[in-house]
Curated annotation (Swiss-Prot):
Pfam families reported for this sequence: Ribosomal_L16
Record organism: Mycoplasma mobile (strain ATCC 43663 / 163K / NCTC 11711) (Mesomycoplasma mobile)
Gene assigned in the entry: rplP
One GO BP: translation
HAMAP family linked to this entry: Ribosomal_uL16
Lineage of the species this protein comes from: Bacteria, Bacillati, Mycoplasmatota, Mycoplasmoidales, Metamycoplasmataceae
CDD domains for the chain: Ribosomal_L16_L10e
Key word RNA-binding present: yes
Protein's UniProt name: Large ribosomal subunit protein uL16
Residue ranges of the region described as Disordered: 1-24
Keywords: Ribonucleoprotein, Ribosomal protein, RNA-binding, rRNA-binding, tRNA-binding
Family designation: Belongs to the universal ribosomal protein uL16 family.
Length: 138
């Protein structure tokens, strides 16, 4: 699963994910088709990995998948039954902040129907509403 190799601080602030749109990382850059978020949410490393597996299994051994988001925020929690205070909890999982219009995955090297179906299957594993977009021709 994805997580940072090292960070300056183990515990991070909880960033807001429901404000505004993504102005960078919102276009198809590497592949031909992309999966674009239409709502905002935190996406965990497990959800990213689950979507990646769903996409690659449908595509078989051909084509290439690009993951455009990375879980760099740590979410902390305290054990059940522990009283308030005594510091912040330990990091439990890593999440990526996906704003509206963030490009989540990209696919290239397969037929158009295969790419669309693979991204559709991958979108079911994610907690955001999404749409499949085609690369804009320059």
């Amino acid at each position: 699963m994805l997580q940072p190799k090292r960070t300056k601080y183990r515990r991070t602030h909880r960033l807001q994910h429901d404000k505004g749109e993504a102005h960078t990382g919102n276009k198809v850059s590497f592949g031909k088709f992309g999966l674009q978020a239409k709502t905002s949410a935190w996406i965990t490393a497990r959800q990213i990995e689950s979507a990646r597996i769903a996409i690659t299994r449908y595509m078989g051994r051909e084509g290439q998948v690009f993951i455009r988001i990375f879980p760099q925020l740590s979410l902390t929690s305290k054990p059940i039954g522990v009283r308030m205070g005594k510091g912040k909890g330990s990091p439990e999982k890593w999440v990526a902040v996906a704003k509206v219009n963030t490009m989540l995955f990209e696919v290239s090297g397969v037929k158009d129907e295969v790419a669309k179906e693979a991204l559709r299957l991958g979108s079911y594993k994610l907690p955001v509403k999404s749409k499949i977009v085609l690369k804009e021709s320059e």
